UniProtKB/Swiss-Prot annotation:
GO terms for cellular component: cytoplasm. ATP binds at residues 895-902. Residues 1306-1588 are annotated as: Shikimate dehydrogenase. The gene is ARO1. Residues 890-1080 are annotated as: Shikimate kinase. This is Pentafunctional AROM polypeptide. It is found in: Cytoplasm. The lineage of its organism: Eukaryota, Fungi, Dikarya, Ascomycota, Saccharomycotina. InterPro entries: 3-dehydroquinate_DH_AS (IPR018508), Aldolase_TIM (IPR013785), Aminoacid_DH-like_N_sf (IPR046346), DHQ_synth_AroB (IPR016037), DHQS/DOIS_N (IPR030960), DHQS_C (IPR056179), DHquinase_I (IPR001381), Enolpyruvate_Tfrase_dom (IPR001986). In the N-terminal section; belongs to the sugar phosphate cyclases superfamily. Dehydroquinate synthase family. PROSITE patterns: DEHYDROQUINASE_I (PS01028), EPSP_SYNTHASE_1 (PS00104), EPSP_SYNTHASE_2 (PS00885), SHIKIMATE_KINASE (PS01128). Residues 1081-1293 are annotated as: 3-dehydroquinase.
Length: 1588
């Protein structure tokens, strides 16, 4: 057990730290703070903790006579830290008669400590407070120092006071119930204090990280009985005693630091702001990422960024930055906002650069507009004794991954610099392998601290190859080797990023690893690029030698599984070494541990990079094993059995490849650079770069055994190198390329060409480096020629010819391909652009992308370039890649034959305005119009699949971002390569849509289709094989049932068009802002309910599918239900709900696998809303949230048992949880036990307005809550078999109740005009009012005087609710309107008067909506961009028709009329963008090339058509034959029901015709919604209007 420790602060020993010190805590408070009243304050979460209950009971039992104990409980979470909660607590204290001697005891985390401390500071002008922190963060930070505060709506901690507590009593035992993430969160502050003040404690923390993470990862949930209430509570539990000593020390040491700093600077005037290390940048991230990210997580990121800033200034060494980053990762904290797990946790929120800087400007350390940041000098010490001023330019650089390199203008020609590159990556990795296999201790100095070596160190540790520790403040790594005997298989895959060296070396090492009782293999894996890089020759050799290895993904690349129960036999091993020398080194280093001595023969030609093999052999010699080179057989080596003996010290030589960059800088800028620790004795081939490349190009070279100095010639005078074989130094060829780019000579025939050969292996490095250099040099205006094993660079005639990379849209970035050497090379060339311009001439910088990739070998390269070599750098918000700037991600449609791909692909292209390509047709074009069937007969299926894959990859590469619809062959998923391409496209944001239908229907169709090659096997077998592939490759899915009638076909088209618009974001899913409802379906199968679905949804903005009620949960069945619902309801938004049993539904609580599958079906089907229960496991919640796409998430919680009153903390906790998940709507359903529960609910609703909230009570007692709920109230229908929850009402019932309460005022509405005796408006609107239970009345007001309408209705009727205006008043009424909509202005008439209140009125025109919606409802797409429109007639309605066709996207609108002279003034009065073309002669129609697919007839219906007009009309009707959809004509007149225009269009030219009655009802329904806020029940209204 640990001892009680007391820590002084401000001269008093008031901080007590111990474990299980409840008795000491009570005794200390009562003895040293005597009082008549003690008030314990905590939140409801803590009330569930047994240790808290024990403390309260003990406190009560120990009270002296005359004293009392009060307890006050607040809701958990930051929302309680408010003025309101403070006032409530103060009122409680006053009511309880508390006086000046009161002692407040704050037991809790930072929220409780801050708020109770502030109450204590102001109550009775200040009473005593004792802090009892229960979270790690509160223990080491917020409870110490006397800072107290509450939040305001404008920011956190804006109102507060310094008020020192009488005691801070820290009991480690509280941490037993701290949630894992909160525990880790607190570690950020612990690491911070060690980092700024206590290097020894930092080292101790490093060595105990794995213990800590093992313990907190073992957190469990346990059920406990509450000693105060006897209720059963569930709390988390961590075995603190398993790491008690470590936890106690980390808390104590962190507290000591803060106490010492506070004692020196209580009011935060200077020294105390050192405690803000990591907070300047961390707080900026927190401001954006809250509440998803916790304070400590953001501070962790801030610490790394601020440490990088210090390194950038040349103050902090790269080693120290690496240590800080490593320890934060080791304790489970994020070090970058871009980490995958952290991005998912923070729901992929963006952190824009300008917002971060703006947030940083609001920092108490700042002085005015100048920002200040704490700068670290080394681990355990800050630079200076307070924060330092930093510029926005430097901050921008640190905060982004894109850097702007300005011209190297201000660098003096006589500049001389000494640069020491980091340790060699090649030597570092070899040294780690050799020391791990060796026996004894080896101190490795100048080890490269990079991503590569970090992965290697982690792997050695995980495989238990050696014990690793650090000395010299982390500069020296101490490897205690165990001679290979302890190597053991680990369960987790070893992730190696893009570390090629580590992957090759560890593959052979894996052959020496021993199995454990539970683990018989290890897995090596890496990032996406690593999984493309070759490793096959090495694997082939090891397999041939007895090691069992499997590829887990791509043949020939990681990931691989190495079985540890196979053996590394030894003997003769043959290896192909023409691709990578690392294969050779890998086997060489492990060979002494084989069962027999090894003879390693390199076969297949001259080995690549032989100097690296020599390096390995020399290093093995240092570790005690001598390799003998054969004298009789070329490239063959003998390695004896044995084991390495570790030298006591091994110093890593600086990386010679990295040294080429500062040396090339000298060459290019005409300055001098010395690298003091690489000379001609170096083990590394790249050490000869200065001598063999730069010297012949015109540089002065001085090279000793251990140093190299380069002095460049005057800028612009470098000479090209006619030929250089860079095989001994292949990695340096990139540096040579950028030097060659600005090299030229006086020979006009040389073309300034530098020829580099011997570098074929560079095509399979981090990227294809030869291609990368050629591609990026071209952006600077430099031409290249690719050679079989090299490259020619054709230098520019003048350095002034270098261009800033750009395209037609402006500057573009230099891509680095996640390759450190590409990035560092181009950082040099970037600075030479415009470097010779006049000094005061403004020069654009060059943008380098993904600068962090240099971390692989030289994390501090940019710092050296900036701080030591004098380059001006800046950071910038990432440019959207030019290819993505106007990106319209293409749609790929996959599915079985006969699924409807051809038809639906056409619909898709039409709906989105995309181009359509059928890949089978493209195949035939590329194969001389040979059909697929013929090709298969002649060449076989395998060859066809290869060609199909090639074509698919090509079109995606070239047109994936350009707005295409690609219709594929049914078997595209048969090829593994095609499947990968499909998945890659989907993961890059593309749409891969699986189209499917009932397999039985498909079989029937396919058996009768002779046009395609026959299936070799049964159709059902094909489907069974492909079904999983279709699902795996697609990110969206649409069920397209077979249609037997044209009406069904058109309904399916409308349904699909809305679906595709929704998933692509063209159609935005809106959360209703006003009163709205959704109906809850409770059918087990919708197939037989299609007729009822429309009336069931009357008055609703959405419909809920209770999936847990469905007959089965198969993907096909559920998708079919969604399809039926969409078709039947004209795609009313769907709420997809799977209600679990514990939340009142039918779905089994623990069936998480099926639940995941159902959510996947929902998201692929593009449902508008998905109900996500807040009680589900966190991983499921985050999975759904991060995959939601355009679907809105409803976070729901139901209390069916009535366990929680609305003022219970359960609801507050759940609301905070919903905020953290960033759901779109919160849905809470309680149970009303009595009427007062409704009042409590309304108070909750009133205080929770920062998210749309659905909050209702169940049971009949809760009906009133449903009436008062505003957004998406759940309702039932009389046509449903039963309601989904007790107490549900219909829309009509709710509206009637709301009216009776005064919520809806009865309105009187009228149709006005003359004559109106036959007007159908009253029956239209009154039908809707009756169905929806609205109290309004619609009547006729017949008059030809607009003045009378104003006097009697607008001014004279206090209940006036609106007017439908007809002839002759549509123009006259406009003078009395206070506002006009755009439609009313353009159409030039008002048919709808909308009251705005205060005797103000808005004039609108819904005729165009009547036309538009009638057309869409009859199969016309919502966007018809590739089709022209036609209007017949030039009267008043024609203006509305033209407006409607323009809104549909018609690229041209033709208009014909009996009197052609009326056309010109009509066209001139309308906007030019309508692109209206008046047709005066029949002949001109023949010249029109456009397809005409949509028309509106606005001519009188009761007279025959004029012959000339009829002739023009018929010529246009012919043009409908090739429209992308069924050509459709709307008749604007609703009497008679069939007009002459309708007859000729339908009977003679097969146009689909829409009667005027539909326009009438659609425009009326549009009015209905504008007046009432409710969607009119269209079908019922239409039937009522047309029944006579």
């Amino acid at each position: 057990m640990v001892q009680l420790a007391k820590v002084p602060i401000l001269g008093n020993d008031i901080i007590h730290v111990g474990y299980n010190i409840h008795d000491h805590l009570v005794e200390t408070i009562i003895k040293h703070c005597p009082s008549s009243t003690y008030v314990i304050c905590n939140d409801t979460n803590l009330s569930k903790v047994p240790y808290y209950q024990q403390l309260v009971l003990e406190f009560k039992a120990s009270l002296p006579e005359g004293s009392r104990l009060l307890t006050y409980v607040v809701k958990p979470g930051e929302t309680s830290k408010s003025r309101e909660t403070k006032a409530q607590l103060e009122d409680y204290l006053l009511v309880e008669g508390c006086t000046r001697d009161t002692v407040m005891v704050a037991i809790g985390g930072g929220v409780i400590g801050d708020m109770i401390g502030f109450v204590a500071s102001t109550f009775m002008r200040g009473v005593r407070v004792v802090q009892v922190p229960t979270s790690l963060l509160a223990m080491v930070d917020s409870s110490i120092g006397g800072k107290t505060a509450i939040d305001t709506p404008l920011g956190k901690n804006f109102i507060g006071a310094f008020w020192q507590p009488k005691f801070v009593l820290v009991d480690i035992k509280w941490l037993e119930t701290l949630a894992k993430r909160e525990f880790i969160n607190g570690m950020a502050e612990v690491i911070k204090t060690a980092c700024i003040w206590n290097a020894d404690e930092f080292t101790r923390l490093e060595s105990n990280a794995s213990l800590f993470l093992n313990v907190v990862n073992g957190e469990k949930n346990v059920k406990v009985t509450n000693q105060l209430t006897n209720e059963i509570d569930e709390i988390s539990n961590t075995d603190i005693e398993a790491m008690l000593d470590h936890t106690y020390k980390l808390v104590l040491e962190s507290i000591k630091v803060k106490a010492e700093v506070v004692s020196s600077d209580e009011r935060e005037s200077s020294l105390r702001n050192l405690l803000n290390f990591g907070h300047s940048i961390g707080h900026a991230y927190e401001a954006i990422l809250t509440p998803q990210a916790l304070h400590g997580e953001c501070v962790s990121i801030g610490m790394v960024k601020e440490a990088e800033l210090s390194r950038y200034f040349g103050i902090l060494s790269p080693t120290q930055v690496a240590r800080l980053s490593k320890i934060l990762v080791a304790y489970g904290l994020p070090v970058s906002p871009d980490e995958k797990w952290f991005k998912e946790l923070t729901l992929h929120k963006k952190t824009p650069l300008d917002i971060l800087l703006k947030k940083m400007s609001i920092d108490k350390k700042n002085e005015g507009s100048k920002k200040k940041v704490v700068i670290l000098e080394s681990i355990g010490k800050c630079y200076g004794d307070s924060a330092q001023f930093v510029s926005d330019e430097d901050l921008r650089f640190i905060l982004t991954d894109e850097t702007l390199v300005y011209p190297f203008k201000d660098i003096p020609a006589d500049q001389q610099k000494v640069v020491i590159p980091p340790g060699s990556k090649s030597i570092s990795n070899r040294a780690l392998i050799l020391a791990a296999l060796g026996e004894g201790q080896c101190k490795i100095k100048n080890l490269l601290h990079s991503d590569d070596t970090k992965h290697m160190l982690t792997a050695v540790h995980e495989l238990k190859g050696a014990t690793i520790s650090w000395e010299d403040n982390g500069e020296t790594v101490v490897v205690e080797g165990h001679g290979g005997s302890t190597l053991s298989a680990c369960a987790d895959p070893l992730y190696l990023g893009n570390a090629g060296t580590a992957s090759r070396f560890l593959t052979s090492l894996a052959a020496l690893v021993n199995s454990t009782p539970s683990q018989k293999y290890i897995v090596l894996t890496g990032n996406a690029r690593m999984q493309q890089r070759p490793i096959a020759p090495l694997v082939d050799s090891l397999r041939a030698n007895g090691t069992k290895i499997e590829y887990l993904n791509n043949e020939g690349s990681l990931p691989i599984k190495v079985y540890t129960d196979s053996v590394f036999k030894g003997g003769r091993i043959e290896l192909a070494a023409t691709v990578s020398s690392q294969y050779v080194s890998s086997i060489l280093m492990c060979a002494p541990y084989a069962e027999e001595p090894v003879t390693l023969a390199l076969v297949g030609g001259k080995p690549i990079s032989k100097l690296y093999v020599d390096m390995t052999i020399k290093m093995m010699e240092k570790f005690g094993i001598n390799v003998e080179t054969s004298t009789t057989e070329p490239y063959t080596y003998y390695i004896p059995k044995g084991h390495y003996i570790n030298p006591s010290e091994y110093v890593i030589e600086s990386d010679a490849s990295s040294a080429t960059y500062p040396l090339a800088f000298a060459a290019m800028t005409g300055t001098t650079v010395t690298v003091p620790n690489i000379g001609f004795e170096s083990l590394q081939g790249d050490a000869r770069f200065a001598r063999d490349v730069l010297k012949p190009m015109g540089c002065k070279i001085t090279q000793t055994a251990t140093s190299t100095t380069v002095s460049g010639p005057p800028v612009g005078t470098l000479k090209p190198l006619k030929h250089v074989d860079m095989e001994p130094m292949t990695d340096a060829f990139l540096t040579a390329c950028v030097v060659a780019a600005i090299s030229h000579d006086s020979d006009p025939n040389s073309a300034n060409t530098t020829t580099i050969e011997g570098i074929a292996n560079q095509r399979v490095k981090e990227c294809n480096r030869i291609l990368a250099m050629a591609t990026e040099l071209a952006k600077f205006g430099v031409k290249t020629t690719e050679l079989p094993d090299g490259i020619q660079v054709h230098g520019l005639n003048s350095i002034k010819d270098l261009k800033v990379p750009s395209d037609s849209s402006g500057p573009v970035g230099v891509c680095t391909y996640d390759d450190h050497r590409v990035a560092m090379s181009f950082s040099l060339l970037a600075g030479m652009v415009n470097s010779q311009n006049e000094r005061d001439e403004v020069a654009n910088p060059v943008r380098i992308l993904e600068r962090h990739c240099t971390g692989k070998t030289w994390p501090g390269w940019w710092d050296v370039l900036h701080s030591e070599l004098g380059a001006k750098l800046d950071g910038a918000e990432p440019l959207e890649c030019t290819s993505k700037k106007n990106s319209k991600k293409s749609v790929v449609i996959i599915g079985m034959r006969a699924a409807g791909k051809t038809t639906i692909s056409k619909w898709c292209a039409s709906a989105l305005g995309y181009k359509l390509v059928d890949l089978d047709e493209l195949f035939e074009q590329q194969h001389n119009n040979q059909s697929v069937k013929q090709f298969v007969v002649e060449n076989g299926w395998e060859k066809f699949r290869e060609e199909e894959t090639r074509i698919f990859k090509e079109v995606i590469q070239n047109y994936g971002d350009d707005g295409y619809v690609f219709s594929t062959g049914g078997g595209i998923v048969e090829s593994a390569e095609s499947r990968k391409a499909l998945k890659d496209f989907a993961s890059s944001g593309g749409y891969v849509l699986h189209l499917h239908r009932d397999i039985e229907e498909t079989i029937v169709f396919l058996q009768s289709d002779p046009s395609r090659p026959a299936y070799v096997e049964e159709i059902r077998e094909v489907w069974n094989r492909r079904e999983g592939w279709y699902k795996e490759c697609s990110n969206f899915s649409f069920f397209a049932p077979h249609c037997s009638a044209e009406a069904e076909f058109q309904a399916l088209r409308r349904s699909f068009s809305k679906y595709i618009a929704t998933i692509t974001g063209v159609r935005e899913i809106e959360i209703p802002s006003g009163r709205s409802a959704f109906v809850c379906l409770t059918f087990d199968d919708l197939t037989e309910q299609t007729e009822n679905l429309t009336p069931i949804c009357y008055g609703c903005e959405a419909v809920e599918v209770r999936v847990d009620h469905l007959a089965n949960y198969s993907a096909d069945f559920v998708s079919k239900q969604l399809s039926i619902l969409r078709k039947a309801t004209d795609s009313i938004p769907i709420i997809f709900t799977v209600r679990t049993m514990k939340q009142g539904g039918n779905f089994l609580d623990e069936e998480f696998k099926t639940l995941r599958e159902l959510y996947d079906i929902a998201l692929k089907n593009g449902v508008e809303f998905l109900d996500l229960e807040l009680t589900l496991p966190t991983d499921i919640q985050y999975e759904v949230i991060n995959k939601r796409g355009n679907t809105k998430i409803i976070g729901s919680h139901h209390d069916f048992q009535g366990l929680y009153s609305w003022d219970d903390a359960e609801w507050e906790n759940r609301f905070n949880q919903a905020l953290t998940l960033d759901v779109d709507v919160v849905k809470f359903v309680g149970t009303a036990v009595n009427f007062e529960d409704n009042l409590r609910l309304e108070h909750f609703r009133d205080t929770h307005k920062n998210k749309p909230l659905i909050a209702v009570n169940m049971t009949s007692k809760g009906s009133i809550s449903r009436v008062l709920n505003n957004v998406l109230t759940p309702v039932t229908s009389d046509l449903l078999p039963n309601s989904a929850a007790p107490g549900q009402l219909t829309v009509a019932q709710i509206n009637k109740m709301y009216t009776s309460m005064g919520g809806i005022e009865p309105k009187e509405l009228f149709v006005v005009g003359k004559p109106i005796g036959h007007s159908r408006s009253p029956i239209l609107h009154n039908t809707g009012y009756e169905i929806l239970g609205l109290p309004h009345k619609f009547d006729k007001f017949e008059t030809g005087s607009a003045q009378l309408v104003k006097e009697k209705l607008l001014d004279g009727n206090k209940n006036f609710g609106g007017a439908a205006v007809t002839i002759p008043l549509k123009l006259d009424i406009m003078q009395y309107m206070d506002e006009l909509t755009d439609a009313a202005k353009v159409i030039g008439a008002v048919n709808t008067v909308i009251p705005l209140g205060n005797k103000k009125f808005k004039g609108d025109n819904t005729d165009w909506l009547g036309i538009r919606n009638a057309l869409i409802n009859n199969g016309v797409p919502e966007y018809v961009g590739h089709t022209a429109g036609l209007v017949i007639g030039a009267g008043g309605t024609s203006r509305a028709a033209l407006y409607a066709l323009h809104s549909l996207g018609c690229k041209k609108i033709f208009i014909i009329n009996r009197t052609t002279s009326k056309l010109k003034p009509l066209i001139e009065s309308l906007p030019s963008e309508f692109n209206i073309i008046g047709i005066e002669s029949t002949k001109s129609i023949e010249e029109i090339k456009e397809h005409v697919g949509v028309a509106v007839s606005c001519v009188p219906a009761d007279k025959p058509l004029d012959d000339e007009l009829l002739s023009k009309l018929e010529r246009f009707l012919v043009k409908g034959a090739h429209a992308a959809f069924v050509p459709t004509l709307l008749e604007a007149a609703y009497k008679p029901s069939v007009t002459p225009v309708m007859t000729i269009s339908q009977d003679k030219y097969q146009w689909h015709v829409v009667p005027g009655s539909q326009m009438l009802v659609h425009q009326g329904v549009a009015q209905f919604e504008k007046w009432t806020g409710f969607k009119g029940p269209f079908k019922a209204i239409f039937d009522a209007v047309t029944k006579e």
